[in-house]
C-alpha cells in the first residue's frame, strides 16, 4: 500500500507540533489531544480549539462541564506557550436522540473564572465504569452562541 507523501508530511508535522512541542516533552512526545489550532483572521493570533458534543448538565447549575485534569492542562499550556483555548460545545438535546441544537463557546480563561470549583462526577464518556471522572461545571449563561 502506498501513501501520499504530502499527506504523510502533513500528518508528521501535525503530530510533531501537537505531541512533541505542545506536549511539552521534546525528547519523548506526550499526546496532547488538541482538536485544532486556528489562526484568527482579525488578530493574526493562533488559538487552540477543544470541541465536545454535550447536552446541558441535568443538575443545577445548568451548564457544561469539563474534566478537572483537562482544565488544568489548558491552564498550564496557556502559561507555558501563551495560547488561549476556545472550548466549543456542539450542544445536543439529549444523549438518546443526540439532536443538534446549536454551537456554544467560551475561552478556557473564562471557563475557569466562572466555573463552580466543586467536584461533580462526570459522565462515563471514554472512561471505564469503575473509574472516577471529576468535572467542574460552568453555567450556561457564560457560553456564547456561535453564529
Q: What residue spans do the PLM features occupy?
A:
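Intrinsically disordered, low-complexity terminal regions enriched in charged/polar residues
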Residues: 97-147
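Short connector loops at helix/strand junctions that flank enzyme active sites
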Residues: 31-33, 44, 48, 69, ...
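Mg2+/Mn2+-dependent nuclease catalytic core
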Residues: 54-76
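Acidic-basic catalytic patches of nuclease active cores, encompassing PD-(D/E)XK
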Residues: 1-32, 80
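Ribonuclease/tRNase effector modules and their secretory precursors
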Residues: 1-9, 13, 65-68, 94-96, ...
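Conserved catalytic cores of phosphodiester-cleaving nucleases, focusing on short active-site segments
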Residues: 34-57
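Nucleic-acid nuclease catalytic cores
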Residues: 75-110
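Short, conserved, surface-exposed binding loops centered on an aromatic residue
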Residues: 28, 37-41, 79
